[in-house]
């Protein structure tokens, strides 16, 4: 697999990411939560980062994104930017 398409939600603290993950598991839409809570400008587009290949994202983020199945949401992933929830959509 050379590339994936993913969305993400970026927050400051792991407990925030865990709270959002719980909301997703209870049926909240990932995209709605990204618009409301993500610190990343992509939040306004539902967290959509589009398609990206290997070497384009920081290693921890890339490893998590490439390890997901389509429509799967990651557990919180820590990078130098904060904590991410990642949803692969393609």
Please annotate each region the language model reported.
Residues 1-26, 41-57, 86-90:
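Well-structured core secondary-structure elements of compact alpha/beta domains
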